[in-house]
Amino acid sequence: MSRCLACMLVALGLIAAGCGGDEGSAGEDADALLKRGFSTDVDSGRMSMDLELSVEGVEGADGPFRLELSGPFRSRGPTKMPDVDMDFTASGQGVNFEGRVVLLPENAWVEFGGDTYEVGQELWGRAQDSLNREGGPETFGDAGVNPLKWVTDAETGDTEEISGTETTEVTGELDVAAMLRDFNRLSPNSSALPRGTLDQIDDAVGPVEFKAWIGDDDIWRKLSSEATFTVPDDHRQGAGGLEGGKISLDMTLRAPNEPVSIESPGEGRPISDLLRALGVPPAALLGPGLAVPAPG
Protein backbone atom coordinates (compact mmCIF):
# COMPACT_ATOMS: atom_id res chain seq x y z
CA MET A 1 0.00 0.00 0.00
CA SER A 2 2.83 2.40 -0.79
CA ARG A 3 0.42 4.51 -2.86
CA CYS A 4 -1.85 4.87 0.18
CA LEU A 5 1.07 6.18 2.20
CA ALA A 6 2.14 8.50 -0.61
CA CYS A 7 -1.38 9.91 -0.84
CA MET A 8 -1.39 10.92 2.81
CA LEU A 9 2.05 12.47 2.60
CA VAL A 10 1.23 14.45 -0.52
CA ALA A 11 -2.22 15.42 0.74
CA LEU A 12 -0.93 17.09 3.89
CA GLY A 13 2.00 18.54 1.99
CA LEU A 14 -0.24 20.14 -0.62
CA ILE A 15 -2.64 21.50 1.98
CA ALA A 16 0.32 22.90 3.94
CA ALA A 17 1.63 24.60 0.81
CA GLY A 18 -0.85 27.40 1.34
CA CYS A 19 -3.84 27.72 -0.97
CA GLY A 20 -7.21 29.43 -0.77
CA GLY A 21 -10.55 27.66 -0.42
CA ASP A 22 -14.24 28.47 -0.87
CA GLU A 23 -16.55 28.75 2.11
CA GLY A 24 -19.28 26.10 2.19
CA SER A 25 -22.86 26.46 3.43
CA ALA A 26 -22.39 23.82 6.15
CA GLY A 27 -19.72 24.34 8.75
CA GLU A 28 -19.12 27.81 7.32
CA ASP A 29 -17.08 29.04 10.29
CA ALA A 30 -14.71 26.07 10.09
CA ASP A 31 -14.34 26.39 6.33
CA ALA A 32 -13.61 30.10 6.63
CA LEU A 33 -11.00 29.43 9.32
CA LEU A 34 -9.29 26.84 7.12
CA LYS A 35 -9.32 29.25 4.20
CA ARG A 36 -7.64 31.97 6.27
CA GLY A 37 -5.15 29.56 7.80
CA PHE A 38 -3.86 28.37 4.44
CA SER A 39 -4.13 31.57 2.41
CA THR A 40 -1.11 33.19 4.05
CA ASP A 41 2.16 32.41 2.26
CA VAL A 42 4.71 30.69 4.48
CA ASP A 43 8.11 31.21 2.86
CA SER A 44 10.36 29.99 5.68
CA GLY A 45 10.33 28.48 9.14
CA ARG A 46 10.96 25.21 10.91
CA MET A 47 9.02 22.06 10.08
CA SER A 48 8.71 18.76 11.89
CA MET A 49 7.01 15.64 10.58
CA ASP A 50 6.18 12.41 12.41
CA LEU A 51 4.98 9.44 10.35
CA GLU A 52 3.90 6.17 11.97
CA LEU A 53 2.92 3.00 10.10
CA SER A 54 1.58 -0.22 11.64
CA VAL A 55 0.86 -3.27 9.48
CA GLU A 56 -0.91 -6.60 9.96
CA GLY A 57 -0.10 -9.96 8.42
CA VAL A 58 3.57 -9.38 7.60
CA GLU A 59 5.95 -11.73 9.39
CA GLY A 60 8.54 -9.89 11.48
CA ALA A 61 6.79 -6.52 11.20
CA ASP A 62 6.08 -6.25 14.92
CA GLY A 63 5.25 -2.83 16.29
CA PRO A 64 5.04 0.40 14.32
CA PHE A 65 7.59 1.87 11.93
CA ARG A 66 8.30 5.51 12.69
CA LEU A 67 9.96 8.22 10.59
CA GLU A 68 10.71 11.66 12.03
CA LEU A 69 12.02 14.72 10.18
CA SER A 70 12.73 18.19 11.55
CA GLY A 71 14.60 21.32 10.54
CA PRO A 72 14.44 24.66 8.75
CA PHE A 73 13.10 25.29 5.25
CA ARG A 74 13.05 28.23 2.85
CA SER A 75 10.83 28.55 -0.22
CA ARG A 76 12.29 29.36 -3.64
CA GLY A 77 8.91 29.77 -5.32
CA PRO A 78 5.86 27.61 -6.04
CA THR A 79 7.50 25.62 -8.84
CA LYS A 80 10.96 25.10 -7.35
CA MET A 81 12.28 22.73 -4.74
CA PRO A 82 12.68 24.49 -1.38
CA ASP A 83 15.94 24.83 0.51
CA VAL A 84 15.86 22.44 3.49
CA ASP A 85 18.12 21.21 6.27
CA MET A 86 16.33 18.24 7.83
CA ASP A 87 17.49 15.76 10.44
CA PHE A 88 15.78 12.39 10.13
CA THR A 89 15.42 9.27 12.27
CA ALA A 90 13.77 5.97 11.40
CA SER A 91 12.97 3.20 13.87
CA GLY A 92 10.87 0.07 14.28
CA GLN A 93 10.26 -3.15 12.35
CA GLY A 94 13.97 -3.97 12.29
CA VAL A 95 15.04 -0.49 11.18
CA ASN A 96 17.09 1.96 13.22
CA PHE A 97 19.07 4.78 11.59
CA GLU A 98 19.43 8.55 11.53
CA GLY A 99 20.93 11.20 9.30
CA ARG A 100 20.48 14.58 7.67
CA VAL A 101 19.38 15.94 4.29
CA VAL A 102 20.40 19.38 2.96
CA LEU A 103 18.97 20.77 -0.28
CA LEU A 104 20.22 24.02 -1.81
CA PRO A 105 19.96 25.37 -5.38
CA GLU A 106 23.56 24.44 -6.18
CA ASN A 107 23.78 20.97 -4.61
CA ALA A 108 22.20 18.37 -2.31
CA TRP A 109 23.79 16.38 0.51
CA VAL A 110 22.96 13.39 2.70
CA GLU A 111 24.71 12.67 5.99
CA PHE A 112 24.40 9.01 6.92
CA GLY A 113 26.46 6.58 8.99
CA GLY A 114 28.98 9.25 9.92
CA ASP A 115 29.76 10.22 6.31
CA THR A 116 28.62 13.06 4.07
CA TYR A 117 27.51 12.31 0.51
CA GLU A 118 26.78 14.88 -2.19
CA VAL A 119 24.71 14.63 -5.34
CA GLY A 120 27.08 17.04 -7.11
CA GLN A 121 26.36 20.37 -8.77
CA GLU A 122 25.96 19.09 -12.32
CA LEU A 123 23.86 16.07 -11.38
CA TRP A 124 21.68 18.08 -8.99
CA GLY A 125 21.11 20.77 -11.62
CA ARG A 126 20.09 18.15 -14.18
CA ALA A 127 17.77 16.50 -11.66
CA GLN A 128 16.01 19.79 -10.93
CA ASP A 129 15.74 20.58 -14.64
CA SER A 130 14.27 17.13 -15.21
CA LEU A 131 11.62 17.71 -12.55
CA ASN A 132 10.70 21.03 -14.12
CA ARG A 133 10.34 19.39 -17.55
CA GLU A 134 8.04 16.55 -16.48
CA GLY A 135 5.05 18.17 -18.13
CA GLY A 136 2.67 18.52 -15.19
CA PRO A 137 0.92 21.78 -14.32
CA GLU A 138 3.15 24.30 -12.55
CA THR A 139 0.71 25.43 -9.86
CA PHE A 140 -2.56 24.33 -8.23
CA GLY A 141 -4.33 27.10 -10.13
CA ASP A 142 -2.98 25.80 -13.45
CA ALA A 143 -4.53 22.41 -12.68
CA GLY A 144 -7.74 23.81 -11.23
CA VAL A 145 -6.97 22.11 -7.91
CA ASN A 146 -7.93 23.44 -4.47
CA PRO A 147 -6.69 20.99 -1.78
CA LEU A 148 -8.97 22.53 0.86
CA LYS A 149 -11.93 21.10 -1.05
CA TRP A 150 -10.70 17.64 -0.03
CA VAL A 151 -11.71 18.46 3.55
CA THR A 152 -15.34 17.51 4.26
CA ASP A 153 -17.60 17.95 7.31
CA ALA A 154 -15.27 20.55 8.83
CA GLU A 155 -16.01 21.64 12.40
CA THR A 156 -14.20 23.91 14.84
CA GLY A 157 -12.99 22.47 18.14
CA ASP A 158 -11.00 23.50 21.18
CA THR A 159 -8.25 26.09 21.42
CA GLU A 160 -4.67 25.03 22.15
CA GLU A 161 -1.33 26.78 22.47
CA ILE A 162 1.28 25.49 20.01
CA SER A 163 4.81 26.91 20.10
CA GLY A 164 3.59 29.98 21.96
CA THR A 165 0.70 30.73 19.58
CA GLU A 166 -2.97 30.34 20.45
CA THR A 167 -4.64 28.07 17.88
CA THR A 168 -8.13 26.78 17.08
CA GLU A 169 -8.60 23.15 16.07
CA VAL A 170 -10.57 22.24 12.95
CA THR A 171 -11.59 18.61 12.40
CA GLY A 172 -12.97 16.84 9.35
CA GLU A 173 -12.33 14.04 6.87
CA LEU A 174 -10.39 13.92 3.61
CA ASP A 175 -12.35 12.93 0.50
CA VAL A 176 -10.04 10.21 -0.82
CA ALA A 177 -11.74 9.90 -4.23
CA ALA A 178 -11.51 13.65 -4.90
CA MET A 179 -7.93 13.71 -3.66
CA LEU A 180 -6.90 10.91 -6.02
CA ARG A 181 -8.57 12.56 -9.00
CA ASP A 182 -6.70 15.78 -8.28
CA PHE A 183 -3.40 13.90 -7.88
CA ASN A 184 -3.81 12.76 -11.46
CA ARG A 185 -4.50 16.32 -12.59
CA LEU A 186 -1.31 17.46 -10.87
CA SER A 187 0.79 14.61 -12.28
CA PRO A 188 2.52 14.50 -15.65
CA ASN A 189 0.55 12.47 -18.17
CA SER A 190 3.10 9.67 -18.02
CA SER A 191 2.63 9.35 -14.23
CA ALA A 192 -1.16 9.46 -14.08
CA LEU A 193 -2.78 6.41 -12.49
CA PRO A 194 -5.47 4.50 -14.41
CA ARG A 195 -9.07 4.77 -13.18
CA GLY A 196 -9.07 1.15 -12.00
CA THR A 197 -6.08 1.79 -9.73
CA LEU A 198 -7.71 4.92 -8.31
CA ASP A 199 -10.84 2.92 -7.49
CA GLN A 200 -8.79 0.17 -5.82
CA ILE A 201 -7.02 2.67 -3.56
CA ASP A 202 -10.28 4.40 -2.69
CA ASP A 203 -11.88 1.06 -1.78
CA ALA A 204 -8.88 -0.03 0.32
CA VAL A 205 -8.58 3.14 2.40
CA GLY A 206 -10.96 3.73 5.29
CA PRO A 207 -12.12 7.15 6.47
CA VAL A 208 -9.18 9.58 6.61
CA GLU A 209 -9.37 11.75 9.71
CA PHE A 210 -8.03 15.29 9.31
CA LYS A 211 -7.18 17.91 11.91
CA ALA A 212 -5.67 21.36 11.54
CA TRP A 213 -4.72 23.93 14.15
CA ILE A 214 -4.98 27.52 12.88
CA GLY A 215 -3.13 30.28 14.75
CA ASP A 216 -4.73 33.54 15.83
CA ASP A 217 -2.45 35.17 13.22
CA ASP A 218 -4.26 33.16 10.49
CA ILE A 219 -1.30 30.83 9.84
CA TRP A 220 -1.62 27.07 10.32
CA ARG A 221 0.57 25.56 13.02
CA LYS A 222 -0.16 21.83 12.95
CA LEU A 223 -1.72 19.24 10.64
CA SER A 224 -2.67 15.70 11.59
CA SER A 225 -4.17 12.83 9.64
CA GLU A 226 -4.90 9.18 10.37
CA ALA A 227 -6.31 6.34 8.29
CA THR A 228 -6.63 2.58 8.13
CA PHE A 229 -6.34 0.46 5.00
CA THR A 230 -7.27 -3.09 4.05
CA VAL A 231 -5.58 -5.13 1.31
CA PRO A 232 -8.07 -7.21 -0.72
CA ASP A 233 -7.73 -10.98 -0.24
CA ASP A 234 -6.61 -11.57 -3.82
CA HIS A 235 -3.75 -9.05 -3.46
CA ARG A 236 -2.32 -10.20 -0.13
CA GLN A 237 0.00 -12.90 -1.43
CA GLY A 238 1.62 -10.46 -3.84
CA ALA A 239 1.98 -7.98 -0.97
CA GLY A 240 3.96 -10.37 1.21
CA GLY A 241 0.94 -11.36 3.29
CA LEU A 242 0.01 -7.77 4.14
CA GLU A 243 -3.59 -7.68 5.32
CA GLY A 244 -3.89 -4.03 6.22
CA GLY A 245 -2.70 -1.45 8.66
CA LYS A 246 -2.87 2.04 10.06
CA ILE A 247 -1.06 5.24 9.04
CA SER A 248 -0.78 8.46 11.02
CA LEU A 249 1.01 11.65 10.04
CA ASP A 250 1.63 14.84 12.02
CA MET A 251 3.24 18.04 10.68
CA THR A 252 4.09 21.02 12.90
CA LEU A 253 5.15 24.49 11.74
CA ARG A 254 7.23 26.72 13.99
CA ALA A 255 8.53 30.27 13.50
CA PRO A 256 6.67 30.85 10.21
CA ASN A 257 8.28 33.43 7.93
CA GLU A 258 11.16 33.95 10.34
CA PRO A 259 14.69 34.02 8.81
CA VAL A 260 16.48 30.67 8.72
CA SER A 261 20.08 29.67 8.06
CA ILE A 262 20.70 26.76 5.68
CA GLU A 263 24.32 26.18 4.73
CA SER A 264 26.30 23.66 2.73
CA PRO A 265 27.86 20.81 4.76
CA GLY A 266 30.88 21.01 2.44
CA GLU A 267 32.42 18.51 0.09
CA GLY A 268 31.25 14.91 0.33
CA ARG A 269 31.54 11.51 -1.30
CA PRO A 270 29.48 10.78 -4.43
CA ILE A 271 25.86 9.90 -3.66
CA SER A 272 26.29 6.75 -5.76
CA ASP A 273 28.58 5.38 -3.00
CA LEU A 274 25.71 5.58 -0.53
CA LEU A 275 23.23 4.04 -2.95
CA ARG A 276 25.52 1.10 -3.62
CA ALA A 277 26.15 0.64 0.11
CA LEU A 278 22.37 0.43 0.58
CA GLY A 279 22.06 -2.06 -2.27
CA VAL A 280 20.30 0.41 -4.58
CA PRO A 281 21.60 0.60 -8.17
CA PRO A 282 22.23 4.32 -8.84
CA ALA A 283 20.45 4.13 -12.19
CA ALA A 284 17.29 2.84 -10.48
CA LEU A 285 16.97 6.00 -8.39
CA LEU A 286 18.76 8.64 -10.41
CA GLY A 287 17.81 7.39 -13.84
CA PRO A 288 20.16 6.00 -16.50
CA GLY A 289 21.10 9.47 -17.65
CA LEU A 290 21.81 10.72 -14.14
CA ALA A 291 23.66 7.79 -12.60
CA VAL A 292 27.21 8.46 -11.46
CA PRO A 293 29.75 5.86 -12.63
CA ALA A 294 31.71 3.95 -10.04
CA PRO A 295 35.19 5.32 -9.39
CA GLY A 296 37.97 3.60 -11.28
Identify the role of each PLM range.
Residues 1-17:
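Sec-dependent bacterial lipoprotein signal peptides
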